[in-house]
Amino acid sequence: MKKAFLLVFAIACTHFLFAQPQQANQPATDPANAQAPYLRFPTLPPFHLLKLDSATFLTKDDVKKHRRTIIMFFSPDCDHCKRQTDSILADFDHFKDIEIVMATYQPFPEMKEFYAHYRLSEHPNIKMGRDEKFFLVPYYKIRNLPYLALYDKKGNLITTFEGTQKTSTILNAFEQKEHGE
């Protein structure tokens, strides 16, 4: 019994010795690799989203120029994403001049059902597409949904949010940017 315990203990110890993610002489973090791409390139990203018609694509060139923009990464079955959509639509008078790009990685039927349920076709400034190439998650290093990236009229990043935000928080971020310039 003692020998079995010692054997298991020795195996466990060697596991921890060899489980180090990097060599001892390497720096703990490489700033170029640690920084998310959206911080290195703080403008509208080159996304490529499959539109609801499942034949054409939504790209950054389809976003109206000289307008504030929100890129919202969401999941149709996420309760926080539903609440965020509800709050934006409830306060839509303040969002009607903001381009909203809603992107998801979830299956097409779920995305279409979400679009229909919230009657997003009634809002021409809201565009939706499926991130089939899974570009946005690593680009923003998304961990929580909904994820919101706010851009000014010039297409420059203002800030990002993870999780449900009050509409006043979103609108204040835009206002601070405009009044700070």
Which residues are covered by each model-predicted region?
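Hydrophobic alpha-helical segments, especially N-terminal targeting/anchoring helices
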Residues: H15, L50-K51, Y151
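N-terminal "domain-start" segment that seeds a small globular fold
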Residues: Q23-D61
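Short, internal strand/loop/helix patches
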Residues: Y118-A149
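Short active-site neighborhood of thiol/selenol oxidoreductases, capturing the structured segment around
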Residues: T59-K82, I88
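Bacterial Sec-dependent N-terminal signal peptides
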Residues: M1-A24, K177-E181
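Thiol-/selenol-based redox modules, centered on thioredoxin-like
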Residues: N144, L150-E181
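Structural microenvironment flanking redox-active thiols in thiol-disulfide oxidoreductases
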Residues: K82-L120, F135-P138
